[in-house]
Regions:
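Short, surface-exposed ligand-recognition loops at beta-strand->loop->(often short) alpha-helix junctions
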Residues: 9-18
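Glycine-rich beta-strand-turn "strand-cap" elements at beta-sheet edges
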Residues: 2, 40-46, 74-97
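An amphipathic, aromatic/His-enriched active-site/gating alpha helix that lines ligand/cofactor pockets
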Residues: 28-36, 55-89
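N-proximal accessory regions
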Residues: 1-2, 19, 56-58
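Short, glycine- and small/hydrophobic-rich beta-strand elements in well-ordered beta-sheets
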Residues: 26-51
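Feature marks short, surface-exposed loop/turn motifs that line or immediately flank catalytic pockets
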Residues: 12, 44-46, 56-60
Length: 97
């Protein structure tokens, strides 16, 4: 399984639009093959920061997600409204028995 964790900080002015864009991206991504989980949350300690959590079946599914045109459009929109650079970390994971 592949886990993606990311975050983006924005301004109070841009937060509603960025949250709406993020939810649209999450809902669309959940329909993609290999997407096990995709969510966005508002950081409890910084309400202008959105935190993303994703689980993908494998690296191939994640790479396919990155090549969906709407994913590129989303990242471009996020970058335009971000304060600083968005953060994204990708991990290979397996369950602990």
């Amino acid at each position: 399984m592949i886990i993606v964790w990311g975050s983006v900080e924005t301004t109070a002015e841009h937060l509603p639009q960025l949250l709406a864009l993020s939810l649209e991206h999450v809902y669309r991504s959940r329909e993609e093959p290999g997407c096990l989980r995709h969510s966005v949350h508002i950081d409890a300690e910084n309400p202008n920061r959105l935190v993303f959590y994703e689980e993908w079946q494998d690296q191939a599914a994640l790479q396919a997600h990155f090549h969906v045109p709407e994913s590129s459009d989303f990242m471009r929109s996020v970058s335009e409204k971000a304060v600083g650079a968005p953060v994204m970390k990708v991990y290979a994971a397996s369950p602990v028995e």
